Amino acid sequence: MEELKFLEEQQVASELIKRVEEFRSQYEVVPETAGRIVKPSIPFYGKDILEMAIAGLLKGENLLLTGPKATGKNILAENLAYIFNRPAYNVSFHVNTNSGDLIGTDTFVDNEVKLRKGTIYQCAEYGGFGILDEINMAKNDAVSVLHATLDYRRSIDVPGYDKIDLHPAARFIGTMNYGYAGTKELNEALVSRFLVIDMPAQTEESLEFIFRRMFPNIKENARTQFIGVFLDLQLKATNSEISTKPLDLRG
């Protein structure tokens, strides 16, 4: 199975891989959401983090990926959705995000008021993986609507409509950076509903993997130099000698 092959390559525990296969067999994807299952641009590299995240998701936990810039938080979230063969629902949080954006709002359809389902509602309904990007940028009153969704109740109560229970395969993966403009500490009540994974900084080994995957024809000397430059920038940013702005793998 292509989606799980790279787990075997990284020597992820065979028991975890077996349980992922069982999860995939148990929860089939409905045709209308199949287009949301997208192969990531690159596999996530890091056996320990993968095992921790997969074990948490199999136990029904929601994940909160924290850590400095350029540690692969979004790549990991996308990989997990792909590994579990679940449709991915991305929500990019910002200061103006409100509960209507997440759960849904009223709209007119054929002269009738109906609910336009939000991203979180659809994720809950179809058993997707909700990727909550930069969750610490939203106001607390906006994300508070997620409390019942993320804890043992696993439900969404839509005012004026009905209560829906989450699909048993639905999971939520939040990502957050510290120190970005507009970010803040998350409410303790919200954090307690996640399994928090602190993402480690890039290493020479992980950067070697990324460069070999993304640029297979690059000259070895050039690859070594690029890796060295990034590690130097990362060290200086960690020691607050420079800003974190130049520390980026996207460019």
Language-model-detected regions and their locations in the chain:
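Conserved core positions of repeat-based scaffolds
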Residues: 228-236
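AAA+ P-loop NTPase catalytic core and its hallmark functional loops
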Residues: 1-228
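C-terminal helical "lid" subdomain and adjoining coupling/linker elements of P-loop NTPases
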Residues: 237-251
